[in-house]
From Swiss-Prot:
NCBIfam families found in the cross-reference section: ATP_synt_delta (TIGR01145), PRK05758.2-2 (NF004402)
A GO term for molecular function: proton-transporting ATP synthase activity, rotational mechanism
Quaternary structure annotation from Swiss-Prot or TrEMBL: F-type ATPases have 2 components, F(1) - the catalytic core - and F(0) - the membrane proton channel. F(1) has five subunits: alpha(3), beta(3), gamma(1), delta(1), epsilon(1). F(0) has three main subunits: a(1), b(2) and c(10-14). The alpha and beta chains form an alternating ring which encloses part of the gamma chain. F(1) is attached to F(0) by a central stalk formed by the gamma and epsilon chains, while a peripheral stalk is formed by the delta and b chains.
Name of the protein in question: ATP synthase subunit delta
Topology in the lipid bilayer: Peripheral membrane protein
Species in which this protein is naturally found: Buchnera aphidicola subsp. Acyrthosiphon pisum (strain APS) (Acyrthosiphon pisum symbiotic bacterium)
Compartment(s) where it occurs, according to its Swiss-Prot or TrEMBL record: Cell membrane
GO cellular component: plasma membrane; proton-transporting ATP synthase complex
Record keywords, A-Z: ATP synthesis, Cell membrane, CF(1), Hydrogen ion transport, Ion transport, Membrane, Transport
Lineage: Bacteria, Pseudomonadati, Pseudomonadota, Gammaproteobacteria, Enterobacterales
Entry annotated with the keyword Ubl conjugation: no
Superkingdom of origin organism: Bacteria
Length: 177
C-alpha cells in the first residue's frame, strides 16, 4: 500500500461514514468526482503549489462548486486545503468506491483479455465469479494485447492469470530449473 493510500484511508472512511449516516453515497461520489476533476485541471494545478493561502484555495473550490457543495463538503475542502492533501484525491475516491462496493456486497473485478470479448461471455464470467464469491460482481474490462492470448482476472489481491504469456513463462521457468 502506498503512502498516499495510507493517508487517504481515514479521509475516505470519514466521508463514507457521513454518506452512510445521511444516505448520500451517490451525492458524495459526485462531490469527490467534482473536487478531483477541478484539482487535476492543468490551469488549477498552479494554485495547488502552495502559492496561495489555504483559506483562499478553499474559497475557490467552494465558489466553483456552489450548486453541489454542502456544509460537509465545505469542511472536507477546508481540511484538504489546510493539510495540502488535494494530491491524494484520486486515492480518496478509489478508497471511497471500494468502501461502497463492500457496503453493497459487491466485488470489483479487473478483467483483461488479449482481444475484445463479447458481452455475453463477460456476463458468463460475471455469473461464475458471483457464484464463487457469493457477491454481486462489477467487472472493469480492458483489452491488453500484451498478454498474447487468454485473460487475467484480478479480484482484490488475488490474480488468476490464464494468459498465454504466463503459460510461456512457466514453461520457460520449468525448462531452466
Amino acid at each position: 500500500m502506498s503512502v498516499a493510500d495510507t493517508i487517504a484511508r481515514p479521509y475516505a472512511q470519514a466521508i463514507f461514514e457521513i454518506a452512510i449516516e445521511n444516505n448520500t453515497i451517490e451525492k458524495w461520489k459526485n462531490i469527490l468526482i467534482f473536487i478531483k476533476t477541478i484539482a487535476s485541471h492543468k490551469k488549477f494545478k498552479n494554485f495547488l503549489s502552495g502559492s496561495i493561502s489555504p483559506k483562499y484555495l478553499s474559497l475557490i473550490f467552494i465558489t466553483i462548486g456552489t450548486n453541489i457543495i454542502d456544509e460537509n463538503a465545505k469542511n472536507l475542502i477546508k481540511l484538504l486545503s489546510e493539510n495540502q492533501r488535494f494530491n491524494i484525491l484520486n486515492n480518496i475516491f478509489e478508497r471511497f468506491v471500494k468502501l461502497e462496493a463492500c457496503y453493497k456486497n459487491i466485488i470489483i473485478v479487473q478483467l483483461k483479455s488479449a482481444f475484445s470479448l463479447k458481452e455475453n461471455l463477460i456476463n458468463k464470467i460475471r455469473k461464475v465469479l458471483e457464484r464463487f464469491f457469493l457477491k454481486k460482481t462489477k467487472i472493469i474490462y480492458k483489452v491488453d494485447p500484451n498478454i498474447l492470448n487468454g485473460m487475467i482476472v484480478k479480484v482484490n489481491n488475488t490474480i488468476f492469470d490464464l494468459s498465454a504469456q504466463n503459460h510461456l513463462k512457466q514453461l520457460s521457468d520449468s525448462l531452466n530449473f
